Amino acid sequence: MDTIEIPALNRPVDATVEIPGSKSLTNRALLVAALAQGDSILENALFSEDSEYFAKCLEQLGIPITLNPHLAQIQLAGRGGEIPAKQADLFVGLSGTTARFISALVALGNGEYRLDGVPRMRERPMGDMLTVLETGGATVNFEGNSGFMPYTVYSQGFAGGNFCLKANQTSQQLSALLMIAPYAQQDTIFEVEGTLVSLSYIKMTCRLMADFGVEVIQIGDNQFQIKAGQRYQAQHYTVEPDASNASYFFAAAAVTGGRVRVKHLTKQSCQGDILWLNVLEQMGCQIKDSDDYTEVTGPKQLQGIDIDMNDISDLVQTLAAIAPFASSPITIRNVEHIRYKETDRIKAVVTELRRLGVQVEEFPDRLKIEPGPITPAEIETYHDHRMAMAFAVTGLKVPGIVIKDPGCTAKTFPDYFTRFFQMLEQ
């Protein structure tokens, strides 16, 4: 297995960086552009394993799509809600957004569509969304455990109507259903039982739908109404830089007491993970925001924090990776759902922090990290891109941190380590 050793710095970082387009926005834009009537162009689109699996699935479904990675541009010809292919065998890799969004998309078709992924993807929950699709007219045939891949969707259009679903494990299922709802045969209302995890991602979905011409009426945090007959309009759409992936560069400034500026990303971003800036501010960082960049300057000493990260749970690993350098303990709460991601992220973080000699307490939905010295070690990444990217930041402060399987970042940020090392050279 390949490894990368992170060079520890004896100085603060001082750099300006550019981050590729958002994975979450790229895949949402691909779906709504495929449903729109006419040609859309996505600028600053992300080219990674996740987005390429998504594009391949659209191509198999008969949506004409042209990828230009050198320009970070994707062109596709939307078919106005039609799914041209009547049969397809679709592979989603380890991409949760592809799995959920494509499953919802094929429910609008009239045919037979099999979906499968890598072994870990077969363990990730799909059931609530599939129950809605079945109630709306589809038939789902599971080859193994009910509610999990692989399965075949037999579809004849989505009826719409009133649905109740749980969203305590992932918000991606609700996002998928929201995006297909304008093409239902009647108005659709989704009511969420209990607390909706990652609400910020639902808000991002609704904002992107509005950018393409469709309104979602939200009542409180738990009810969403979509009028039937609305149609997405083809767009020339620029994807924002990925706020989740920018978090590692901002964390580098925080942990070294340095300065990092990320171009073309601002506090006005529609991505919920821009709230990472608020976390860093509470820990003692200074934030400078302009109309075309955001800049973080780290303090001499990071402060501990007790924080609910339900809405920004993709950043748990980023915070955990810098937590040992704080002046007091860091407690991360309300993130049980991250146990169902690319790996059990709570367990993985706890295991690797302990490998580094850090004292950490694990609970079902939270963890508490004590500050203290770190022992160099090789970090297991569990095929999880965010483990590799986050613990690289730890290595800036401690010599001898080695990241195993750095290629796993290809899922959302193929050239992460190239850009990370370029930041260090500035």
UniProtKB/Swiss-Prot annotation:
A GO MF term: 3-phosphoshikimate 1-carboxyvinyltransferase activity
Quaternary state and interactors: Monomer.
Origin organism lineage: Bacteria, Bacillati, Cyanobacteriota, Cyanophyceae, Nostocales
Binding positions (3-phosphoshikimate): 23-24, 28, 170-172, 198, 314, 341
Domain of life the protein comes from: Bacteria
Locations listed in the record: Cytoplasm
Catalysed conversion reaction: 3-phosphoshikimate + phosphoenolpyruvate = 5-O-(1-carboxyvinyl)-3-phosphoshikimate + phosphate
Tagged with keyword Glycosyltransferase: no
Keyword list, A-Z: Amino-acid biosynthesis, Aromatic amino acid biosynthesis, Cytoplasm, Transferase
InterPro entries: Enolpyruvate_Tfrase_dom (IPR001986), Enolpyruvate_Tfrase_sf (IPR036968), EPSP_synthase (IPR006264), EPSP_synthase_CS (IPR023193), RNA3'P_cycl/enolpyr_Trfase_a/b (IPR013792)
Primary residence: cytoplasm
Cellular component GO terms held in the UniProt record: cytoplasm
Protein's name according to its UniProt entry: 3-phosphoshikimate 1-carboxyvinyltransferase
Naturally occurring in which organism (per UniProt): Nostoc punctiforme (strain ATCC 29133 / PCC 73102)
List of catalytic residues: 314 (proton acceptor)
NCBIfam families referenced in this protein's UniProt entry, alphabetically: aroA (TIGR01356)
